[in-house]
Amino acid sequence: MRPLQAEIIKALGVQATIDPETEVRRSVDFLKAYLKKNTFLKTYVLGISGGQDSSLAGALTEKAMQEMRAETGDDAYQFIAVRLPYGEQADEADAMAAIDFMHADVVKRVNIKPSVDAMVAAVEADGSKISDFNKGNIKARMRMIAQYAIAGNNAGAVIGTDHAAEAVTGFYTKFGDGGADLTPLYRLDKRQGAALLKVLGAPAHLYEKAPTADLEDNRPALPDEVALGVKYKDIDDYLEGKDVTDQAAETIEKWYQKTAHKRHLPITVFDNFWK
């Protein structure tokens, strides 16, 4: 095993093998424990894209809320699923299928296009130009603004979908989809997340669909693997301590080092990870 590989595995808490049912219970208990400790909270809010990660996080969250209602008799415990399209979403059917699978208690829809376009126009008012990539990050951050607005109105906390295969590459928008209160998938790689969905009875297309951030107008539905230059199979193998090609390992490690700032709170004078 490569030296940095061992360090990364430890830092992200990845196990080489898992029992999916045990990990489902671990995540559900984690979500419930946070509510029991923070009794002012009554809802969890999650943006739903129709991909594997939000499908799994949503299913785990709904299960936690069902158990909280059963255990406490308090029907105020609710899971709020939020659709956050930029105008019309090409894979809207996938998102609605995910919501149907997880049986969300409440479903809301917020079209972020007017807000995103207004922000782009405001920044460009001085003659500068927002790149398509930068605009994609604005979309991700606007989605999180909407989720926190909904959470604030409903005594809620925001659920994130970050997992080990995403964390190792930093493949998320800082203070966008990377900003949340709780991340129940953290420690799981991509194939492990799919294994949890299988035991939860998810339709296969929810975990077989090619992962995409789908943030760029000029490159819609760009597959994650194309953007990263490495396949999730190799990322998962790497995180599980298996051998991968030097090229795959070097690509993963390059992303890990380049995106270290995303895995830290705002940098202070006491931090030295970046030096």
UniProtKB/Swiss-Prot annotation:
Organism: Lacticaseibacillus paracasei (strain ATCC 334 / BCRC 17002 / CCUG 31169 / CIP 107868 / KCTC 3260 / NRRL B-441) (Lactobacillus paracasei)
Keywords, alphabetical: ATP-binding, Ligase, Magnesium, Metal-binding, NAD, Nucleotide-binding
Catalytic activity as recorded in UniProt: deamido-NAD(+) + NH4(+) + ATP = AMP + diphosphate + NAD(+) + H(+)
Classification via SUPFAM superfamilies: Adenine nucleotide alpha hydrolases-like
PANTHER family: NH 3 /GLUTAMINE-DEPENDENT NAD + SYNTHETASE, NH(3)-DEPENDENT NAD(+) SYNTHETASE
GO molecular function (one): NAD+ synthase (glutamine-hydrolyzing) activity
EC annotation from Swiss-Prot or TrEMBL: 6.3.1.5
Binding-site residues for deamido-NAD(+), renumbered to this chain: R141, K174, D181, H261, K262
Pfam families in the cross-refs: NAD_synthase (PF02540)
Family: Belongs to the NAD synthetase family.
Protein name in UniProt: NH(3)-dependent NAD(+) synthetase
Assembly behavior: Homodimer.
Gene: nadE
Superkingdom field: Bacteria
Entry binding sites for ATP: G47, I48, S49, G50, G51, Q52, D53, S54, T161, K190, T212
Binding site for Mg(2+): D53, E166
CDD domains in UniProt: NAD_synthase (cd00553)
Role: Catalyzes the ATP-dependent amidation of deamido-NAD to form NAD. Uses ammonia as a nitrogen source.
A cellular component term, taken from the record's GO annotations: cytoplasm
Family matches, as InterPro entries: NAD/GMP_synthase, NAD_synthase, NH(3)-dep_NAD(+)_synth, Rossmann-like_a/b/a_fold
Presence of the UniProt keyword Manganese in the record: no
Pathway terms, separated by semicolons: Cofactor biosynthesis; NAD(+) biosynthesis; NAD(+) from deamido-NAD(+) (ammonia route): step 1/1
Gene Ontology BP terms: NAD biosynthetic process
EC primary class: ligase
Coiled-coil residue windows: none
